[in-house]
Amino acid sequence: MDNSHDISVLNTLIATTLDSMKGYRESAEDSENSTHAQFFREMAEERSQVASDLQQQVRSLGGDPEMDSSTAGAAHRGWVDLKAAITGHDEQAVVNEVERGEDYIKGKFETAMQDDELSPAARGAIEKCFESIRKGHDRASQMKHAMADVD
């Protein structure tokens, strides 16, 4: 059985998840709010675990898992760094960028789950990991809206 499509889809999600992990780590460093920084560190760890789970699935399919983030993710982190420099690490700007990143990764996983060419094993692994992605998205969204309510 040719697993190349599954491996390709999974590796794309791995790169996106590693982007997210790195983004959370950088957001934790940029945050001046200890509660937010702790949330960002927790999410970085969760994303590291999701990437590890997906990498294991690629190995089980006989593939070489992606071990690094994407070029697009590096560009986004560069934009976040530039925006932080311009806004002076404004907490609202950091949280807004985190939520934007969450919208992106959630969309990537949702698109992958709609892929009719995926094997049941790959789909199952993606769906399992999506639970963490969805929860992270919802928490980031709640954080953003809570900050907006305070303003």
State the predicted function of each range.
Residues 2-31, 93-117:
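Alpha-helical bundle segments that constitute or directly flank the non-heme di-iron/ferroxidase center
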Residues 6-13, 34-53, 91-97, 121-133:
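Alpha-helical scaffold segments that form or flank carboxylate-/histidine-based iron centers
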Residues 13, 20, 27, 50, ...:
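Amphipathic alpha-helices that form helix-helix packing interfaces
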Residues 24-31, 58-61, 86, 113-116, ...:
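Secondary-structure edge/capping motif, primarily at the C-terminal ends of alpha-helices
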Residues 35-73, 140-144:
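Conserved alpha-helical segments that form or flank metal/cofactor-binding pockets of metalloenzymes
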Residues 38, 45, 65-82, 122-132, ...:
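Charge-rich, acidic-biased intrinsically disordered regions
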Residues 56-106:
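Carboxylate-rich helix-loop segments that flank metal/cofactor sites and access channels
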Residues 94, 98-151:
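Preference for long, well-ordered alpha-helical segments
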